[in-house]
Regions:
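Juxtamembrane intracellular "pre-TM" segments in multi-pass secondary transporters
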Residues: 45-82
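Short amphipathic helix-loop junctions that connect adjacent transmembrane helices
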Residues: 98-114
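Helix-loop junctions at membrane interfaces in 12-TM secondary transporters
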Residues: 160-172
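Structural signature of the two symmetry-related core transmembrane helices
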Residues: 143-158
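Intracellular juxtamembrane helix-capping segments at the cytosolic ends
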Residues: 181-194
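Helix-to-loop junctions at the C-terminal end of transmembrane segments
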Residues: 127-141, 225
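Multi-pass alpha-helical transporter architecture, strongest
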Residues: 32-43, 236-260
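A membrane-interface helix-boundary motif in multi-pass transporters
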Residues: 4-31, 223-242
Length: 260
Protein backbone atom coordinates (compact mmCIF):
# COMPACT_ATOMS: atom_id res chain seq x y z
CA UNK A 1 0.00 0.00 0.00
CA UNK A 2 2.86 2.37 0.81
CA UNK A 3 4.59 1.60 -2.49
CA UNK A 4 1.39 2.17 -4.43
CA UNK A 5 0.93 5.49 -2.63
CA UNK A 6 4.49 6.45 -3.57
CA UNK A 7 3.53 5.93 -7.21
CA UNK A 8 0.09 7.55 -7.10
CA UNK A 9 0.99 10.48 -4.82
CA UNK A 10 4.74 11.11 -5.20
CA UNK A 11 4.53 14.69 -3.93
CA UNK A 12 3.29 13.45 -0.54
CA UNK A 13 6.60 11.59 -0.13
CA UNK A 14 8.61 14.58 -1.39
CA UNK A 15 9.30 12.85 -4.70
CA UNK A 16 9.45 14.65 -8.03
CA UNK A 17 7.55 12.21 -10.23
CA UNK A 18 5.77 8.86 -10.44
CA UNK A 19 8.90 7.41 -12.03
CA UNK A 20 10.88 8.36 -8.96
CA UNK A 21 8.15 6.78 -6.86
CA UNK A 22 8.65 3.49 -8.71
CA UNK A 23 12.42 3.61 -8.14
CA UNK A 24 12.05 4.22 -4.41
CA UNK A 25 9.41 1.50 -4.23
CA UNK A 26 11.92 -1.05 -5.48
CA UNK A 27 14.47 0.24 -2.99
CA UNK A 28 12.03 0.00 -0.08
CA UNK A 29 11.10 -3.57 -1.04
CA UNK A 30 14.79 -4.53 -1.09
CA UNK A 31 15.25 -3.04 2.39
CA UNK A 32 12.11 -4.84 3.59
CA UNK A 33 13.39 -8.21 2.34
CA UNK A 34 16.82 -7.62 3.89
CA UNK A 35 15.49 -6.68 7.33
CA UNK A 36 13.06 -9.58 7.60
CA UNK A 37 15.63 -12.05 6.27
CA UNK A 38 17.98 -11.33 9.18
CA UNK A 39 16.05 -13.52 11.70
CA UNK A 40 16.14 -16.37 9.18
CA UNK A 41 19.92 -16.11 8.77
CA UNK A 42 20.57 -15.80 12.51
CA UNK A 43 18.11 -18.14 14.20
CA UNK A 44 17.06 -20.84 11.72
CA UNK A 45 19.51 -23.72 11.76
CA UNK A 46 19.87 -25.87 8.69
CA UNK A 47 19.38 -29.58 9.21
CA UNK A 48 22.26 -31.81 8.25
CA UNK A 49 21.57 -34.70 5.91
CA UNK A 50 23.68 -37.82 5.58
CA UNK A 51 23.00 -38.07 1.87
CA UNK A 52 25.75 -36.42 -0.15
CA UNK A 53 24.70 -34.39 -3.16
CA UNK A 54 26.34 -35.47 -6.40
CA UNK A 55 26.74 -32.50 -8.72
CA UNK A 56 27.79 -34.58 -11.73
CA UNK A 57 25.29 -34.37 -14.61
CA UNK A 58 22.74 -32.32 -12.59
CA UNK A 59 20.35 -31.76 -15.50
CA UNK A 60 20.28 -35.41 -16.46
CA UNK A 61 19.64 -36.47 -12.87
CA UNK A 62 16.95 -33.82 -12.43
CA UNK A 63 15.03 -35.04 -15.47
CA UNK A 64 15.50 -38.63 -14.32
CA UNK A 65 13.99 -37.82 -10.92
CA UNK A 66 11.02 -36.10 -12.56
CA UNK A 67 10.52 -39.09 -14.85
CA UNK A 68 10.69 -41.53 -11.94
CA UNK A 69 8.21 -39.44 -9.94
CA UNK A 70 5.84 -39.42 -12.90
CA UNK A 71 6.06 -43.22 -13.11
CA UNK A 72 5.12 -43.38 -9.43
CA UNK A 73 2.21 -40.98 -9.93
CA UNK A 74 0.81 -43.14 -12.73
CA UNK A 75 0.32 -45.91 -10.16
CA UNK A 76 -2.22 -43.69 -8.37
CA UNK A 77 -5.02 -43.01 -10.86
CA UNK A 78 -6.89 -40.37 -8.78
CA UNK A 79 -3.66 -38.38 -8.41
CA UNK A 80 -2.96 -38.51 -12.14
CA UNK A 81 -6.50 -37.46 -13.06
CA UNK A 82 -6.41 -34.56 -10.62
CA UNK A 83 -3.05 -33.34 -11.94
CA UNK A 84 -4.38 -33.31 -15.50
CA UNK A 85 -7.40 -31.28 -14.40
CA UNK A 86 -5.16 -29.03 -12.32
CA UNK A 87 -2.90 -28.35 -15.29
CA UNK A 88 -5.86 -27.08 -17.32
CA UNK A 89 -7.55 -24.82 -14.79
CA UNK A 90 -4.43 -23.46 -13.07
CA UNK A 91 -3.02 -22.44 -16.46
CA UNK A 92 -6.14 -20.38 -17.11
CA UNK A 93 -6.17 -18.92 -13.59
CA UNK A 94 -2.52 -17.87 -13.69
CA UNK A 95 -3.05 -16.36 -17.13
CA UNK A 96 -5.85 -14.16 -15.81
CA UNK A 97 -3.71 -13.02 -12.89
CA UNK A 98 -0.58 -12.37 -14.96
CA UNK A 99 -2.29 -10.66 -17.88
CA UNK A 100 -4.87 -8.59 -16.01
CA UNK A 101 -2.86 -5.37 -16.28
CA UNK A 102 -2.14 -5.89 -19.98
CA UNK A 103 -5.83 -6.60 -20.57
CA UNK A 104 -6.89 -3.44 -18.75
CA UNK A 105 -4.32 -1.40 -20.66
CA UNK A 106 -5.61 -2.73 -23.99
CA UNK A 107 -9.11 -1.65 -22.95
CA UNK A 108 -7.83 1.89 -22.38
CA UNK A 109 -7.78 2.12 -18.57
CA UNK A 110 -5.01 4.27 -17.10
CA UNK A 111 -2.27 2.73 -14.98
CA UNK A 112 -3.45 4.38 -11.75
CA UNK A 113 -6.83 2.65 -11.89
CA UNK A 114 -5.20 -0.66 -12.78
CA UNK A 115 -2.85 -0.50 -9.80
CA UNK A 116 -5.71 0.36 -7.46
CA UNK A 117 -7.68 -2.58 -8.89
CA UNK A 118 -4.77 -4.93 -8.15
CA UNK A 119 -4.54 -3.65 -4.56
CA UNK A 120 -8.31 -4.07 -4.30
CA UNK A 121 -7.87 -7.72 -5.31
CA UNK A 122 -5.32 -8.29 -2.56
CA UNK A 123 -7.45 -6.61 0.12
CA UNK A 124 -10.38 -8.83 -0.77
CA UNK A 125 -8.22 -11.91 -1.26
CA UNK A 126 -6.77 -12.01 2.26
CA UNK A 127 -10.03 -12.41 4.23
CA UNK A 128 -11.68 -14.29 1.36
CA UNK A 129 -9.08 -17.06 1.57
CA UNK A 130 -9.98 -17.71 5.22
CA UNK A 131 -13.68 -17.63 4.39
CA UNK A 132 -13.09 -20.03 1.53
CA UNK A 133 -11.37 -22.46 3.87
CA UNK A 134 -14.35 -22.35 6.24
CA UNK A 135 -16.78 -22.97 3.38
CA UNK A 136 -14.63 -25.85 2.13
CA UNK A 137 -14.88 -27.52 5.53
CA UNK A 138 -18.62 -27.01 5.60
CA UNK A 139 -19.57 -27.89 2.02
CA UNK A 140 -16.63 -30.03 0.94
CA UNK A 141 -13.30 -29.41 -0.74
CA UNK A 142 -14.39 -30.73 -4.12
CA UNK A 143 -17.59 -28.68 -4.18
CA UNK A 144 -15.80 -25.44 -3.34
CA UNK A 145 -13.13 -26.09 -5.95
CA UNK A 146 -15.83 -26.51 -8.57
CA UNK A 147 -17.55 -23.32 -7.36
CA UNK A 148 -14.27 -21.42 -7.63
CA UNK A 149 -13.66 -22.58 -11.20
CA UNK A 150 -17.26 -21.71 -12.13
CA UNK A 151 -16.67 -18.19 -10.81
CA UNK A 152 -13.57 -17.93 -13.00
CA UNK A 153 -15.66 -19.07 -15.96
CA UNK A 154 -18.15 -16.31 -15.12
CA UNK A 155 -15.23 -13.84 -14.97
CA UNK A 156 -14.23 -14.81 -18.52
CA UNK A 157 -17.79 -14.35 -19.77
CA UNK A 158 -18.29 -11.08 -17.87
CA UNK A 159 -15.08 -9.72 -19.40
CA UNK A 160 -16.91 -9.56 -22.74
CA UNK A 161 -19.17 -6.84 -21.36
CA UNK A 162 -16.59 -4.55 -19.73
CA UNK A 163 -17.25 -0.93 -20.66
CA UNK A 164 -15.91 1.01 -17.67
CA UNK A 165 -13.36 0.99 -14.88
CA UNK A 166 -16.18 -0.05 -12.52
CA UNK A 167 -16.61 -3.27 -14.49
CA UNK A 168 -12.88 -3.91 -14.21
CA UNK A 169 -13.06 -3.40 -10.44
CA UNK A 170 -15.91 -5.92 -10.26
CA UNK A 171 -13.73 -8.45 -12.07
CA UNK A 172 -10.83 -7.66 -9.73
CA UNK A 173 -13.09 -8.25 -6.74
CA UNK A 174 -14.32 -11.58 -8.11
CA UNK A 175 -10.75 -12.72 -8.69
CA UNK A 176 -9.89 -11.73 -5.13
CA UNK A 177 -12.79 -13.80 -3.80
CA UNK A 178 -11.57 -17.07 -5.28
CA UNK A 179 -7.88 -16.74 -6.16
CA UNK A 180 -6.38 -17.79 -2.83
CA UNK A 181 -9.22 -20.18 -2.05
CA UNK A 182 -8.91 -22.20 -5.24
CA UNK A 183 -5.16 -22.54 -4.78
CA UNK A 184 -5.38 -23.60 -1.13
CA UNK A 185 -8.23 -26.04 -1.76
CA UNK A 186 -6.33 -27.54 -4.69
CA UNK A 187 -3.30 -28.19 -2.50
CA UNK A 188 -5.47 -29.72 0.22
CA UNK A 189 -7.21 -32.02 -2.24
CA UNK A 190 -3.86 -33.11 -3.65
CA UNK A 191 -2.54 -33.81 -0.15
CA UNK A 192 -5.58 -36.02 0.50
CA UNK A 193 -5.02 -38.00 -2.69
CA UNK A 194 -1.32 -38.79 -2.40
CA UNK A 195 0.37 -41.39 -0.18
CA UNK A 196 1.94 -39.52 2.72
CA UNK A 197 5.23 -41.38 2.49
CA UNK A 198 5.68 -39.92 -1.01
CA UNK A 199 4.44 -36.43 -0.18
CA UNK A 200 7.75 -34.67 -0.81
CA UNK A 201 8.36 -35.94 -4.33
CA UNK A 202 4.67 -35.78 -5.29
CA UNK A 203 4.36 -32.17 -4.15
CA UNK A 204 7.54 -31.38 -6.05
CA UNK A 205 5.83 -32.66 -9.18
CA UNK A 206 2.67 -30.73 -8.27
CA UNK A 207 4.66 -27.50 -8.07
CA UNK A 208 6.37 -28.33 -11.35
CA UNK A 209 2.96 -28.71 -13.00
CA UNK A 210 1.91 -25.34 -11.60
CA UNK A 211 5.04 -23.58 -12.83
CA UNK A 212 5.01 -25.14 -16.29
CA UNK A 213 1.28 -24.66 -16.81
CA UNK A 214 1.54 -20.94 -17.57
CA UNK A 215 2.52 -21.54 -21.18
CA UNK A 216 -0.60 -22.34 -23.15
CA UNK A 217 -2.82 -19.68 -21.56
CA UNK A 218 -0.84 -16.54 -22.47
CA UNK A 219 -0.14 -17.90 -25.96
CA UNK A 220 -3.84 -18.69 -26.42
CA UNK A 221 -4.93 -15.25 -25.21
CA UNK A 222 -2.42 -13.47 -27.45
CA UNK A 223 -3.27 -15.57 -30.48
CA UNK A 224 -7.05 -15.14 -30.17
CA UNK A 225 -6.75 -11.42 -29.44
CA UNK A 226 -4.60 -11.06 -32.56
CA UNK A 227 -6.94 -13.06 -34.81
CA UNK A 228 -10.06 -11.18 -33.74
CA UNK A 229 -8.25 -7.88 -33.13
CA UNK A 230 -9.97 -7.69 -29.74
CA UNK A 231 -8.45 -8.38 -26.29
CA UNK A 232 -11.83 -9.62 -25.06
CA UNK A 233 -11.60 -12.55 -27.45
CA UNK A 234 -8.34 -13.50 -25.75
CA UNK A 235 -9.86 -13.70 -22.28
CA UNK A 236 -12.96 -15.61 -23.34
CA UNK A 237 -10.70 -18.15 -25.06
CA UNK A 238 -9.55 -19.29 -21.61
CA UNK A 239 -12.79 -21.27 -21.45
CA UNK A 240 -10.90 -23.74 -23.65
CA UNK A 241 -8.82 -24.48 -20.54
CA UNK A 242 -11.39 -24.01 -17.79
CA UNK A 243 -14.07 -26.30 -19.22
CA UNK A 244 -11.85 -29.39 -19.70
CA UNK A 245 -10.35 -28.74 -16.28
CA UNK A 246 -13.67 -28.75 -14.47
CA UNK A 247 -14.99 -31.73 -16.46
CA UNK A 248 -11.91 -33.85 -15.76
CA UNK A 249 -12.26 -33.07 -12.05
CA UNK A 250 -15.48 -35.08 -11.94
CA UNK A 251 -13.49 -38.20 -12.84
CA UNK A 252 -11.52 -37.91 -9.59
CA UNK A 253 -13.03 -40.50 -7.19
CA UNK A 254 -14.63 -38.54 -4.37
CA UNK A 255 -13.95 -41.39 -1.95
CA UNK A 256 -10.21 -40.79 -2.44
CA UNK A 257 -10.55 -37.45 -0.64
CA UNK A 258 -11.64 -39.09 2.61
CA UNK A 259 -8.80 -39.82 5.00
CA UNK A 260 -8.97 -42.66 7.49
Amino acid sequence: LINVSMYLYPSFFNLDSQTEGILYSFLSVAVWWFIFSIPLFLFVKQKNFDELIDFKNPFQKSFLRVFNTFKEIKKYKPVLIFLIAYWFYIDAIDTIVRMAVAYGTDLGFDSSKLIIALIFTQFIGFPATFAYGYLAEKFGLFNMLVVGILIYIFICIYSLFITSATDFFILAGLVGLVQGGVQSVSRTIFSRLIPQEKATEFFGFYNLIGKSAVVVGPALVGWMAYIFNNPKAGIISLLILFIPGILILFYVPRASLVRD
